[in-house]
Every structure is written in structure tokens, then in C-alpha cells.
Amino acid sequence: MENTVQIPPVLIGRHDECATLKECMASNRSEFVIVCGRRRIGKTFLVDQFFENRYDFSFVGKHKTKTQTQLNYFAKAIQKYSGQKQKTYADWYDAFDALEYYLETLPVNRKKIIFIDEMPWIDTQRSTFVSALENFWNGWANRRYDIVLIASGSATSWMADKLIDNQGGLHNRITRRLYLEPFTLSETEEYFKSFDSPLTRYDILQCYMFTGGIPFYLSLMNPQMSVAQNIDMLFFHKSAPLRREYDELYSALFTHVDSYIKVIEILYDHKYGLTKREISKATKLNGTFLNTVLNNLELCDFIENFELFGKKNTLVYRLVDFYTLFYFKFIANRHNKDTEWWSHNLDDAGIRAWMGLTFELICMKHHKQIKKALGISGIGTSVSTWKCLPDTENEIPGAQIDMLIERSDK
């Protein structure tokens, strides 16, 4: 058996985010950076690749773990980096005091990098984590010039409530916010080219239709297999890794997840979108809470709002998450035992219809790239949709235009 050398992963895209991190390293102040984005988007990968895993301290929160156990792991992490045996911490104030003490032993002429990943998992019920973090930042780190604290986590609700929109001691303390979006089609092509995949551009377009450019989903694919074989492997085999992804996707991100699922399901049933008033009527959600749900879903790229042509004050919300759309169409409520269902049904009318609708959505998601290809990226434009309801009385059919680009100079 020949020895093989594992090729290290390559950081695709993320140019703006890397530029921001470089600015943090060069600034003359301490930086509190939060890295946001949906589950599987590559938050940890970005930070690890940029810093080449060279941290002065790093810690990963543990899922559904009691406070004292989290504190014990935190103590072990400080012991690993400092080389000094740690006592048992009574609370998070003790833990951050120990972190301060260790960091003060490091050279003063460089930035110290602290990476706390899965931060929402650390904040267990009745823990003192957030208040201790506030004390650490306001009372010590923010008064220095050499600290870069990076906080990351998939739980969007927590990141928004506790950090971004914090009304307490962390109010307006975040110095940089990195929001990671899914790969574009171009970045997805770059990803496959990075290991000499034989997939054609049409193949890559089809891959985008069910992965939506989510890096982790792309990483599960076998680039030497056909698109159909990959779909069977990812969704229809007995141990298919993405078959159960939906069960965790939203619950990992949001509290009150049932309300989020209500919005997702009603938007799936109305593929061309609903206004906020229509969503409220269908889900019985309203007011500030509905605004929060819609904002968080938009933040994670699950939904988008579009203007209706000629009605600039009317926003329509549409489900745009490619994985969720694929799951509802072909996986949910289906109990087919065929492990190669996709390969056996390539001419299925449902697949053809899905591909048509999904291609429209890809165009909407890439309207900036389309404008650039048309040579109008430097001109002010608005992107909207247009629809005309059928007039049954006069036997006039309805019509829809999925993407209208209106130039401001015409």
C-alpha cells in the first residue's frame, strides 16, 4: 500500500474577512471580533486557516454541558497554553481572572490572539459567563492595545441577543463583525478546481442547486463521482449524511425554533414569496417577535426579501435556502427505500420542475454577478420581481417575471 500525503485544505474566497483580520492585527487598539454565519458555513475553518492555528489561547464551548464541566475544560485549556497547573474555578469570573493573569505573562510587543469558539454553548443556564465576559473586556482587555478576542458560534439568536444587540456592558463593544455567506457559483467552481475535480460547469451548477454553496456540504461530495451519484450518496443511502441535517439545522441556530419552522414551511408553500402581513396571518406571529424571526432568518441566508416591481414599499419574503428547498421537495415525508432514487429518476417531471425553479433562484442570488456581466455594475439599479394575477372573468392568464433589473439612468 502506497503512502499518501494529505493535501491541506485551501481557504476559498473570504477575501474581505481576511482583510479585516489583517487590519485587526495591525491596529493600535484591542479588537473584539465576532464571526457570524449559519451552521456549516466555515466560521471555525476561516479563523483557523487565517491564524494557522497559532493562538495564545483558544477554547471551544461544549454542547449541552454543565457550567462546572465547562469551567474544568477552560482550566485545562489555560494549563495547556500557560504550562501552569490551574485550580478549580468557582465561576466564570475566576476563569477570566486566570486568563488575564496568563496573558499578562506574554510579551508586550505583539497582539495576543484569543479564539473562543461555540461561545453560545458556554452560556449555560444561570451561569455567569456573559457578565464575566463583560468584566474581562471592559475592565481589562479594552484598556490595552494588544488583545484580539475572536468569538464565534452558530446559535444566531444568542450571538444577536448577547453580543450584537447587547444592551448591557457589551453594548457597542464589538469592534469588528465578520458575516460569512455561502460560496458563490464562482467560488464553488474554485473549490472544485482546488483538487482537480473533473466536474463541468453544468455539473457544478447542479451541485449548487442542492448545496447552495455551503462549504461543509460541498466537502461531503466525492468529486470523482457524477452529480447523480453524489445526490444518492448524500441524501438517499441508508447512512446519507444530509438526510437528517434538517432536524438539526434550525434548532442549532435559533431559540423558539418552532416559530422559525412555521415561517420556513409557509414560505415553502408559497414559492414566490409572501409579504410580512401575509406571513403574520398564516403563522399567527406578529410584532417585534416576527421581525426578529425574519431578521434572523435573513441573517443566515435562509430567506430574502425582494421588492415588487412598481410597489417599492412592498417587500416579499421568499425561502432561498437551497438545502431546505431540496429537503422539502425530495426527502421530507418520503419513505422511498431506493438508495439510488435520484439516478433512477433523472427524467422525473418533479426533478425537471425543481431544476427550473432552482435555476431562477440561483440567478436572483447572483444578481450582482449578472449586472457585472451586463456591464452595468457601476450604475444604480434596483432588483425586483413582478407578477400579475390571473383574471378568470376575462380568461386572462397570470404571469410572473422572477427578476427585473431597473436602471436608475433610464
Language-model region placement:
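Phosphate-binding site recognition
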Residues: 1-341
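A cross-kingdom feature that marks ATP-driven nucleic-acid transaction machinery
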Residues: 309, 315-410
